Curated annotation (Swiss-Prot):
GO biological process: DNA recombination; DNA repair; DNA topological change
Organism of this sequence: Bacillus anthracis
Protein name per the record: DNA topoisomerase 3
Task performed by this protein: Releases the supercoiling and torsional tension of DNA, which is introduced during the DNA replication and transcription, by transiently cleaving and rejoining one strand of the DNA duplex. Introduces a single-strand break via transesterification at a target site in duplex DNA. The scissile phosphodiester is attacked by the catalytic tyrosine of the enzyme, resulting in the formation of a DNA-(5'-phosphotyrosyl)-enzyme intermediate and the expulsion of a 3'-OH DNA strand. The free DNA strand then undergoes passage around the unbroken strand, thus removing DNA supercoils.
Family to which this protein belongs: Belongs to the type IA topoisomerase family.
Length: 729
């Protein structure tokens, strides 16, 4: 009997699909049943070949050999995962297999993972596509009942290949040109470089900012009411101190007459459902989680616990076909503290409206929402529980009615000047009940603060006991943190050097710099390349990052290039542009930037050379700030030796409770805190043993230290290493 091979992206998803399809016979890298053989990739198993596979001379990085422009880029099996590639290949080539079902992640990159494997195997069998947004049993069954023809995704595949090949031509050539021309480990790309440029621009804004003092007036009445002065244009601030001084002097011994009490009934609706970027922003603001960390937690909740839908989505809406599943999802997530809230929603028919249901705003995947899967909180880690809480509360909030309140504005006259006060009376808590009325609106910047207003009638006279001048200073723009950098990457139009509205709109509609799936990796890569560094929560550009921006061609610094590329990649995905035309343009552009770098007369200066020599090659080591501590890195790219000098750990200072830094090597390591606290590693081990009731042994401490090291080191797995060399996205 003929069978179908199902290619999943990861083993965990493959196991879920195999269970639903009753494939319980285990093989080498696959699971088999009567109709289906389920096998899996491990992320990418196949990638674009290194330059040296085209010509042995490219093994050495020489400026005169650039640009490297092979006529056709080749695919190669990633060495570290070759065993699994061969396992997939053997199943695809079986004579009893007459169909391939692509079940990798439903998106551009997922399409590439499977199609590159199929292309490398050189197999020509009919392809079908499984396109689902969650991996619950129900979603898998429904997906297999509605498989799509593979041909429907040919253009999406062409778009994914075009992006990868363009990044190879431009990224590898620009990086080699910069590194060999300026004798420094420099890398750039169409997303990395403009992101660094945005951080530099923000620092320049802060540096050039000149604070101005502004002035206002506040009147306090005997019934504890605070009144705020406003000019004829409704402004509460003035930069003219003399003017404010004069007004204050003229108001002495005047009382306030109530001219008007304006009552307005207002509504506010819940913020939209989460896409990945919005979730990463909130997790960073509330819990300090990095974008990468939030994505990893979401992946667990999606794949392992099966309680949330696909994380790598750029939509904040659900499609109309999902509305019918909402009651089941509410029942599933309506446990524990969420039970009364979910029960309240289920009492009435769910009203689907355009604020969260819009087919036109859902492309590959809908917003992140709970699945119909069983929720077992005892299996969650603390971090998983926090992320799940964010998603469930947002899901419940959009299903609750609007927050309704009465806005009261009190307008008074003191002398000849206008003073106002504002208050709010809640009429119906609505969606804010989900957040126990503690939801904070980020955009509230009004100088007139809301207060509890006493009972007052129009025409009343209020006794003024104090009139005082207030003052403040204008603030410089805040430095980027991971939350605000994600926002800037998502909508970088203010940093573009073009007035082309269509291009700006395309950048906005295609999600800005990078994609929801790649932004976390891009930020991580910038930290690991020492182009940016973290001080507290703030992100700073390094000297290396500054110099890179001075050395790269101007176009590579602007989001405009990404806007143009995304416009064309979108056209390829829609079948409106041939991949070959786009790649031809990219090759020509590569020639231009390599030529510009070659002819540059600028110099790169290492200003972080340490007194230490590299133990491998003897060259001076560079001292750099890694994401979680200081490191020594060999300045020779081909050597690549690096070593931790210190790293921030999760151990807390017993005096000030801040995170301790671990310095030194071996038995001589010490924990140090900014407050001045110092503790030897051996003493720390003894203290931990006592605190845990003598249960901790040497193995426990070693395990703890190993975990710290694992958290500190950059992502290092076979596909990450291969992709690090080839993808500059």
């Amino acid at each position: 009997m003929a069978k179908s091979v199902v290619i999943a992206e990861k083993p965990s998803v493959a196991r879920d699909i195999a269970r639903v399809l009753k494939c319980d016979k285990k093989g080498n890298g696959y699971l088999e049943g009567s109709k289906y053989i389920v096998t899996w990739a491990l992320g990418h198993l196949v990638t674009l070949a290194d330059p040296e596979s085209y010509d042995v001379k490219y093994k050495k990085w020489n400026l005169e050999d650039l640009p490297m422009l092979p006529e056709r880029l080749k695919l190669t099996v990633i060495k570290q995962t070759g065993k699994q590639f061969n396992a997939v290949k053997s199943q695809l080539l079986r004579k009893d297999v007459n169909e391939i079902i692509v079940a990798t992640d439903a998106g551009r990159e997922g399409e590439l993972v499977a199609r590159w494997i199929i292309d490398k195997v050189r197999i020509n069998k009919p392809i079908k596509r499984l396109w689902i947004s969650s991996v619950t049993d129900k979603a898998i069954k429904d997906g297999f009942a509605n498989l799509k023809p593979g041909k429907a995704y040919d253009n999406l595949y062409a778009s994914a290949v075009a992006r990868s090949e363009a990044d190879w031509y431009i990224g590898l050539n620009a990086t080699r040109a910069l590194t060999t021309r300026f004798n420094a480990q420099l890398n750039c790309g169409r997303v990395q470089t403009p992101t660094v440029a945005m951080i530099a621009n923000r620092e320049d804004e802060i540096k050039n900012f000149k604070a101005q003092t502004y002035y206002g007036i506040e009147a306090q009445t005997t019934n504890q009411l605070k009144l705020t002065w406003q000019d004829a244009n409704g402004n509460s601030r003035s930069f003219n101190k003399e003017k404010i001084d004069g007004i204050v002097k003229g108001l002495d011994k005047h009382n306030a007459t109530v001219l008007e009490i304006d009552k307005k009934q207002k509504k506010s609706f819940s913020p939209g459902l989460y896409d990945l970027t919005e979730l990463q922003r909130d997790a960073n603001k509330k819990f300090g989680y990095s974008a990468k960390e939030t994505l990893n937690i979401m992946q667990k909740l999606y794949e392992q616990h099966k309680v949330l839908t696909y994380p790598r989505t750029d939509s904040r809406y659900i499609s109309s076909d999902i509305v019918g599943t909402l009651p089941e999802r509410l029942k599933a997530c309506g446990v524990g503290e969420y039970r009364p809230l979910a029960h309240k929603v289920l009492q009435k028919p769910i009203k689907a409206n355009k604020s969260f249901v819009d087919d036109s705003k859902v492309s590959d995947h809908h917003a992140i929402i709970p699945t119909e899967g069983y929720v077992n909180f005892s299996a969650f880690t603390d971090k998983e529980r926090k992320i799940y809480d964010l998603v469930v509360k947002r899901f419940l909030a959009v299903l609750f009615p609007a927050f309704e309140y009465e806005q009261l504005t009190l307008r008074t006259k003191v002398g000849n000047e206008t003073f106002i006060a504002r208050g709010k009376t809640i009429l119906h808590a609505g969606w804010k009940e989900v957040y126990e009325n503690r939801f904070e609106d980020d955009d509230v910047t009004d100088d007139v603060k809301e207060q509890l207003l006493p009972r007052i009638e129009k025409g009343d006279t209020l006794t003024v006991k104090l009139i005082m001048q207030t003052s403040g200073q204008t603030k410089a723009p805040a430095r980027f943190n991971e939350a605000t950098l994600l926002s800037a990457m998502e909508n970088p139009t203010k940093y573009m050097d073009t007035q082309n509205k269509q291009l700006a709109d395309t950048l906005k509609s295609t999600g800005g710099l990078g994609t929801v799936a790649t932004r976390a990796d891009i930020i991580d890569k910038l930290f690991n390349s020492f182009l940016i560094e973290k001080r507290g929560k703030d992100i700073h550009i390094t000297s290396k990052g500054r110099q890179l921006l001075d050395l790269v061609p101007e176009e590579l610094k602007s989001p405009t290039l990404t806007g143009e590329w995304e416009q064309k990649l979108e056209a390829i995905a829609k079948g409106k542009l041939k991949k070959e035309v786009f790649i031809s343009e990219m090759k020509n552009y590569t020639k231009e930037i390599v030529s510009e770098i070659k002819s540059s007369d600028k110099k790169y200066k290492h200003d972080n050379i340490s007194t230490k020599s590299c133990p491998d090659c003897g060259k001076p080591m560079l001292e750099v700030n890694g994401k979680k501590g200081k490191m020594l890195v060999c300045q020779d790219r081909e050597c690549g030796h690096r070593k931790n000098v210190s790293r921030t750990t999760n151990a807390r200072c017993p005096q000030c409770k801040k995170k301790l830094e671990l310095r030194g090597e071996g038995a001589g390591q010490i924990f140090a805190c900014k407050c001045g606290y110092r503790e030897k590693l051996s003493t720390f081990q003894e203290r931990r043993k006592k605190e845990s009731g003598n249960k901790a042994d040497k193995r426990d401490v070693q395990k703890y230290m190993k975990q710290q090291k694992k958290e500190e080191e950059p992502l290092n797995n076979p596909f990450a290493e291969a992709l690090k060399k080839l993808k500059f996205d």
